Amino acid sequence: MIRETLEGERDMSAPIAKLTLIPESPTAREAPLHVVSPEEIAAHPSPFVSPAPTVTLLRDESTRHPFALAIAAAWTCYGTRPAKVENVLKLVSEPAPDGLSPEKAADRASRRDRALKLYADLFAAGHHTTLQHATFVFVLDNVSRLAIWSFFHAHPFYNSEQVSQRYREVSGNVMVTPDLPEPALSIYRAAIERSLEGYRRLTEILTPDFQRDYARIFPARAKAKGETAAKRMADAVQKRAQEVARYVLPLATPAHLYHTVNGLTLLRYYVLANQPDAPTEVRYVVNRMVEEVLALDPYFLGAPGYPLDLRMLGAGDALEARALADWRTNLAQTAEETEAFCQRFDAELGEWENSRLVSSNPDGERLMAEAVRTVIGATPGAMSDEDALAQVLDGARNPYLGHALFLAMNSKLMQTMNHVPFTFQKRISGAEDAQNQRHRGTLSSGPLLTAHLRREPDVIVPWAIARNPEARAEYDATIRAIWDAKNALLDQGVSPEWALYLLPNSHRVRFYESGTLLTYFWKWIKRLCFDAQREIFETALEDVAQVRAVFPIIGRYVDGPPCVMRSRSGATPICPEGERFCGIPVWRDYAFEELASRRVM
């Protein structure tokens, strides 16, 4: 999944080229082979007046010799025994031993040259599994939520642990701020300050509501005396309040995270970093990532004389940008055209607020049952469709469903769930989609944000704000202020790239998402938990309600949170959350139809 936004009305080639390591070309196929030096990568300054994003490679936790590892892996394919990385390093990095005959010295030199060339040959020929053995663990800091959403988490091949806006108060001491001319910079900074003011004010307004909610669920805790008990309740309530208040925070809010990728993914980052949405920031961060790896292994981008033919894409070369035929045409898109698209999309959702099931195989239950019977060599006479589905989905018959690990990916019987596909049409907030991206088996085709920008605020209203008139007034005023600032920047000719940083977390994103029963199964279980953020919980409810309607047998088994699944399988403890227990024994007398009404916070 590639998420993009287009550049500004004016010619943006200069600032983008400043961050592109090869001359831009009319097409990626025509791009000349360019040898990139570490000096080039390090030469590009930060595009921000705020503290620059930082990138640290954890060397002890990462692969130290990605080049040699790829060569050893390739040699292993044709060797009589596994090749050793240390043997590759001796051949490539160390001088020839003393006393070699001229013939042996020449043979060694030839083998060394072939090894150096093999890395580039593997890349060019598409034998890319050899590049996936190398793993790099990065610590990223001061990276915007926009860059993380639009690039670093917009694909399935990563792992991240990111600071939570739900559970960590946002101080606002550092907010990502581009180097804009005046008066645009003042408009931008004022909008940031207004969003932070709204965030703090909403946290304050919502706190009494959540105090009452918390006391309703945990009356003993609310009545407990002492400093420790009071702090426990205050901390829990504050987290709930700031979880909702964060919807007014802009995408300029920075984050720190652990981000782990393999060598192949990092090379893809390097080629595609100029994609729209946040190309300047992403290019800066990716350059730092590659710089860190090159300091560890100078051959990561190819050996001397045999560089990888990366053909890095310029800002206008991305497939999505070309599909729009002309960036200027898209950027001249009228407000009426944007409104027509959004209204049509929203109308198609019909009765559903967040998610509509638009495609599934009507024969899905029978097909999955046939797959189950095929795995174990049974006939329909020996095992009915309902029994076959229960063998996989019923916790009483499948002990894997009570295991702490999600074992379906490695279970032959549970892999039969792959044969039941779904596609949903979704309209959710950016805050929810940032959570949604973590479910990397349910892939979406995310929007070009610039093509979806509307003049009037296009946001969701969180449930806790909708129920409190004072909070709703503050929310609306904050959203209006930052939305007007976004419009003002665009009216002044500021690149949409920078205006996007002012979008609030509550901005709507519209897209299609697909997966299989296997990939949705764990997502639905986790997101139907009362500890899940409210909005993604409500989306999961809509997903499951529609699946239950089209697949009644499957639906009866995928309709509950972890505690329900574990109670059906006999696993203990029934709630796996420990001190994070929601306080409501959902599994008792469970009925999907009553799940939403039983949730308090």
Language-model features, listed with the residues they occupy:
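A conserved ligand/cofactor-binding region detector
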Residues: 2-601
